[in-house]
Every structure is written in structure tokens, then in C-alpha cells.
């Protein structure tokens, strides 16, 4: 499945992609270049899988304290629909910046890999699936999507719900567009910046 294999690499600036891929190929055989560092970041599955799975299983996480199988017990069809909806939003944002759109089912990828069946859930809500993947994953992605005019109602909802569960403002965490140096860029300026630096 393309989301897991091969390892995707984005280069900043993208105009140096061939040079970087050539240098890395001997160390990481089978790597795949993507259009930009943003497209690479938006293709990360951790926030797409962890955040909806953890938010929809928060009660189970608190009760079981890690004694349940996250990817089998926690990933029913309704959870998978939310994963796919959020994945779609990140794909549309990546496509808007010039990246490829993934069409693979995340649930099928998880079900098709026996290694996922062994993984137990987080033991509490202080786990990195919440504390990192919400503010540094989907909250930052949603900010980027807003910058280029892409709505992210699913991501925004999950950031809000995560804030309630964690008793914090998850939307204020993560990276701001100002910290990334792209706050005042329109879509064309952002595309040019990603290619040329």
C-alpha cells in the first residue's frame, strides 16, 4: 500500500529533490520523492490514524488503561469512516499545494498488516497520540489548509474535541504559519517557496 511503503521524502526546496534522493537512496533503498515537504507531511498517517481513533475510543482508553488492541478493537467501520474523511481533507490540502491525492483505504491497510493486530492502546489521555498528533499534526494541518482556502471541518472538530478531552486549547499548540515563515503567502507564493526556497 502506498501510504506505508515506500518511505516518502519531501525536500526543501523541492528543486533539490533529485540531489537529495540520490544521496539517500543507498541508505534508504526504495524511497519515493513527493512534490514538497508539505505534501510529505500531509501524507503522514500518525495524525490521521491516532487522533480519530483516540478521540472515539477515549472512554475505552481511560477504562482499559492500555489493555485493549487499538487497531482491531478500536477501529470499527464508523471509526474508519472518520479516518477516511480526515484523510480526504489532508489529501485535498496536499493537492491544493501541488501534491498527489491518496485513494487507498486506511482501514484496508491496517487490516492487511498483521503487525497492527498486536498493538495495544494508549494507557491514558496524556499519550503522544493526543499531546503531539493533535497540536503538531491536525491542528497545524488545518491552519495550513485555511491559509490556502481549503475547509477542514473534520479536522477542526477533532481539534475541538481533543481540547475538551485534554482540557487545553489544542488549536493553539503546534506550529503557527508565522513560525513556518509562510503566514502572508498566498497559494502561488507558497508553491513557489516550496519549489525554490
Tell where the protein language model's regions lie, with residue ranges:
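Rossmann-fold dinucleotide-binding core
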Residues: 1-67
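Serine/threonine-rich low-complexity intrinsically disordered regions
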Residues: 13-16, 102, 176
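Inter-helical turn/loop segments and adjacent helix faces that build the functional surface
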Residues: 28, 73, 77, 145-148
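C-terminal substrate-binding/catalytic lobe of Rossmann-fold NAD(P)-dependent dehydrogenases
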Residues: 41-135, 139
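Long, low-complexity C-terminal extensions of enzymes
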Residues: 96-100, 107-195
Amino acid at each position: 500500500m502506498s501510504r506505508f511503503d515506500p518511505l516518502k521524502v519531501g525536500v526543501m526546496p523541492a528543486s533539490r529533490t533529485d540531489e537529495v534522493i540520490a544521496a539517500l537512496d543507498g541508505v534508504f533503498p526504495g524511497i519515493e520523492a513527493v512534490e514538497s515537504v508539505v505534501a510529505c507531511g500531509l501524507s503522514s498517517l500518525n495524525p490521521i490514524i491516532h487522533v480519530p481513533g483516540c478521540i472515539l475510543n477515549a472512554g475505552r482508553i481511560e477504562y482499559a488503561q492500555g489493555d485493549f488492541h487499538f487497531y482491531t478493537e478500536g477501529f470499527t467501520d464508523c471509526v474508519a469512516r472518520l479516518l477516511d474523511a480526515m484523510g480526504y481533507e489532508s489529501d485535498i490540502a496536499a493537492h491544493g499545494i501541488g501534491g498527489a491525492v491518496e485513494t487507498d483505504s486506511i482501514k484496508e491497510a491496517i487490516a492487511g498488516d498483521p503487525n497492527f493486530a498486536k498493538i495495544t492502546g494508549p494507557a491514558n489521555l496524556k499519550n503522544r497520540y493526543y499531546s503531539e498528533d493533535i497540536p503538531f499534526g491536525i491542528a497545524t494541518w488545518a491552519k495550513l489548509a485555511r491559509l490556502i482556502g481549503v475547509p477542514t471541518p473534520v479536522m477542526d472538530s477533532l481539534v475541538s474535541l481533543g481540547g475538551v478531552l485534554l482540557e487545553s486549547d489544542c488549536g493553539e499548540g503546534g506550529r503557527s504559519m508565522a513560525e513556518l515563515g509562510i503566514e502572508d503567502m498566498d497559494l502561488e507564493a507558497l508553491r513557489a517557496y516550496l519549489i525554490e526556497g
